[in-house]
Design a protein with these regions (language model features):
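N-terminal amphipathic, basic-rich helices that act as targeting or association modules
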Residues: 10-24
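Acyl-thioester C-C bond-transforming condensing/cleaving domain
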Residues: 8, 27-37, 48-187
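Acidic/polar N-terminal loop/beta-strand segments that form early-domain functional surfaces
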Residues: 14, 46-48
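Conserved catalytic motifs of the protein kinase core domain
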Residues: 40
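Short, small-residue-biased leader/transition segments that mark boundaries at the very start
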Residues: 1-6, 189
Length: 189
């Protein structure tokens, strides 16, 4: 989980999702942290946007203030897309490959593919890989709406999200995260 309130306040929502789903995946794997060679374990995380809430709230606070350039010292660390991979690696003591894929809606898929290939190429034996996003707020909704990327089927929520339908008209914005534990013994190459 996220631990104490202090830690939650230091993490953007997209990073909170990442930590929680990584913990769930690790617990589900049945692995024991102390039995893992940290030098052969890594984290590859995907996020297309990163800490949008942090960027938005800090910018609004600055804009409505007296013009003094005073930002929270955690402003940049909270919003950069690769911060979840760092937090997860530190939590589990993983010192192997650690990076983030940023490729829009495919970021999480690319993270999983990169983890698979890093195992195949003998760069590591185990990865926590996945992705998270948290952009359901004014600039996220407004930005995707301005691009005309959101579904306009507001009258029927059951049909609004239809990505494979020939009559689709956009996507439904959501947030959350997902993670898998990939390990050498389960990949048959």
């Amino acid at each position: 989980g996220l631990g104490d309130v202090y830690k939650r306040q230091k993490l953007d929502r997209f990073c909170q999702f990442a930590v929680v789903v990584s913990d769930q995946a690790f617990i589900d794997s049945g692995l024991v942290k102390e039995k893992i060679n940290g030098d052969r374990a890594g984290v590859i995380w995907g996020s297309g946007i990163g800490g949008m809430k942090t960027f938005y709230s800090e910018s609004v606070n600055f804009g409505t203030g007296n013009g003094t350039p005073r930002f929270n010292p955690f402003f940049i660390p909270k919003l950069i897309s690769d911060i979840p991979a760092g937090h997860i690696s530190i939590k589990y003591g993983f010192r192997g490959p650690n990076f983030t894929t940023v490729s829009a809606c495919a970021s999480s898929s690319h993270a999983l593919i990169d983890a698979f290939y890093n195992i195949k190429w003998n760069k590591a034996d185990l990865f926590i890989a996945g992705g998270s996003e948290a952009c359901v707020l004014e600039p996220g909704i407004g930005g995707f709406n301005a691009m005309m990327a959101l579904s306009t089927r507001n009258d029927d929520p059951k049909t609004a999200s239809s990505p494979f339908d020939k009559d689709r008209d956009g996507f439904v914005l959501g947030e959350g995260g997902g993670a898998l534990v990939l390990e050498l013994s389960l990949i048959h190459i």
